[in-house]
Amino acid sequence: LLSRRQRQMCIRDRSMTNEEFLKSLFWGKQRGTNREGYKLAAILLFGKEQTILNCCPWHRTDAIYRSVSYERFLHPLPTDPDIRYNDRDMICVNLIQSYIRLLNFVQRNMPDKFRLADNGIDRLDLRVMIFREVISNTLLHREYISSYTNKFLIFRDRVITENWTKPFQTGDIDINDWRTRTKNPLITKVFLSLIHI
């Protein structure tokens, strides 16, 4: 079921019940068997942890913070302490909760540079402005049938994201002939309505 917060963010037609909303977006027939049911996107977006792990046992995002530079991590000095990580969050919850936990992880482990808005009064959180896009992309453009663990790695000098995906094209990207393609359109549709992208 949808939480009250998810319901307020997702459902614009307030007269719809939770079940009507989920069926309107995520109900379909399975190819080959013609069995009807909810699509995996519904479970990944709104499911409870146990339901998600039953349907997609490899679904997780491993968020790791290391207080050293990336080069220092790859080539430590003999005098460096043996620190595997300073903070870690193994996230195995639905995508909406994953988004919130990853954003909290970024805010907890990355410095907040002071910046004022154009009006000169309001303070801007550049971390949120930048990383809501990065986090959304790592969650939206993942290949959810792959068992590869999604990784979100923060180092002192860079952030690295890793997720399994099948590219639509190979070779060089031509900026004059660039077209975006949605990897998971149902998940993207819900995230757009949540104003996370």
Task: Label each region the model flagged.
Residues L1-R7, I11, I195-H196:
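Single conserved hydrophobic/aromatic residue that forms the stacking wall/gate
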Residues Q6, A41-A42, F46-S98, L126-L194:
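Conserved beta-strand-loop-beta-strand hairpin that lines the nucleotide-binding pocket
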Residues R12-I52:
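Extended, Lys/Arg-enriched charged tracts that mediate electrostatic binding to polyanionic substrates
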Residues T17-F21, A117-L124, F152-I154:
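Long, charged, glycine-rich C-terminal linkers/tails
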Residues F21-S24, F105, V190:
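Residues that form generic nucleotide/phosphate-binding pockets
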Residues F26-K29, V106-F114, R142-E143:
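Structural motif corresponding to the C-terminal cap of alpha-helices
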Residues I91-G120:
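Helix-hairpin-helix/helix-loop-helix acidic hairpins
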